[in-house]
Amino acid sequence: MSKRGRGGSSGNKFRMSLGLPVGAVVNCADNTGAKNLYVISSGVRGRLNRLPAAAVGDMVMATVKKGKPDLRKKVMPAVIVRQRKPWRRKDGVFMYFEDNAGVIVNPKGEMNPSAITGPIGKECADLWPRIASAANAIV
């Protein structure tokens, strides 16, 4: 694995449908005090003129659009834990959630908050063990 890659993640991630392009506003699923996160960049850049997009388990750079004033107007990393866009798992099941959500992390992928509201995707739990330990349901 290269030196510059996923901070606290372990293992590989299969190809999945990218459901959250740059400019997407997602719910914040942790107890930091942020309500909405605005995705400003993603690691994946695809075809010419296509917006970079992210999926469950991807780390993105985001800002807080609604929430505590001390969290707003700062760029911070976040990990996507739920997406509405259906994706296909290796066992043939098509999976999707009822909302788009992410959690705020530090650059290494460790969480400061202690709780995550709602379920998280198995792809995210496999890659980010600190997020998986704080989740109450892994789907």
Curated annotation (Swiss-Prot):
Q: Which GO terms describe its molecular function?
A: large ribosomal subunit rRNA binding; structural constituent of ribosome
Residue runs in coiled coils = none
Task: Output a single Gene Ontology CC term carried by this record.
Answer: cytosolic large ribosomal subunit
- Keyword Ribosomal protein in the entry? The reply is yes
InterPro entries per the record?
A: Ribosomal_uL14, Ribosomal_uL14_CS, Ribosomal_uL14_sf
Read off the SMART domains from this record. Answer: Ribosomal_L14
Pfam families cross-referenced by the UniProt entry = Ribosomal_L14
Kindly state which keywords UniProt assigns to this record, in alphabetical order.
Ribonucleoprotein, Ribosomal protein
Please list the GO biological process terms of this entry: translation
PANTHER family annotated for this entry?
50S/60S RIBOSOMAL PROTEIN L14/L23, LARGE RIBOSOMAL SUBUNIT PROTEIN UL14
What protein family does this chain belong to?
A: Belongs to the universal ribosomal protein uL14 family.
Protein name from the UniProt record = Large ribosomal subunit protein uL14
